[in-house]
Amino acid sequence: MKLFFTTAMALSMGLMVMGQSQRLVLAEGFSNASCGTCASQNPNYNTLTAANSYPNNPAKLVAIKYQTNWPGTDPMNAQNPTDIASRVSYYSVSGVPWGALDGTAYAGSSYSGALANLNQTTINNRYAVTSPFDLMVQHSINPSMDSVTITVNINCTDTLQLGSGVVKLHVALTEKTITFSTAPGSNGETSFKGVVRKMYPNGNGTT
């Protein structure tokens, strides 16, 4: 089986500022292979995020998924429970499916954070907000596919007045598509998109 991995990254900040760089929006989703509502919301959500992601031009966002260990069985969570738990704790996620765009829960006619709330207008509006940083990532996977080297270069393109500990870098290794011959959980899903496999150095990020 050939695996396709993506390195996704984000800077989380305690201060909203205007910058001079093009933003690449981060769409974070929380799901579970045994969640019936997840199976209902994921198809449209995955189609929408894929339409706005590389290789489409312009690529407006990067979409990543955290597979939780509840409400039922999920082997993808079992592969990396610690990093996922830290992101669940960070957002105080109490139910799935749930998601956030650049750290803010999806808003709309459904419950706060519902994946069904995300729409093209929301993506376009967020994409139009400039970023105070330029980020460049280079990664290489060794031939045996058991390790990856990631280099991140960050350039501030706007003046920021930030104290120590306010800015954090989050780096995630995601698998583009995971396909099972039979559903690994109880909701019938067999294909999973943008699943977070590892966060570096962990789910808490680097200050």
Locations of the language-model features?
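Bacterial Sec-dependent N-terminal signal peptides
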Residues: M1-Q22
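Feature targets compositionally biased, intrinsically disordered low-complexity regions
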Residues: M13, M18, E28, N187, ...
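Short, conserved sequence motifs used for protein processing/export or organelle targeting and
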Residues: P58-T207
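Intrinsically disordered, low-complexity boundary segments flanking structured domains
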Residues: L11-S12, Y45-S53, R87, N119-Y127
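A generic structural signal for short, solvent-exposed coil/turn residues
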Residues: L11, G19, A27, P55, ...
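The N-terminal extracellular segments of secreted preproproteins, especially immediately downstream
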Residues: L11, S34-T37, N155
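Local sequence-structure signature of Cys/Sec-based thiol-disulfide redox active-site neighborhoods
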Residues: Q20-T68
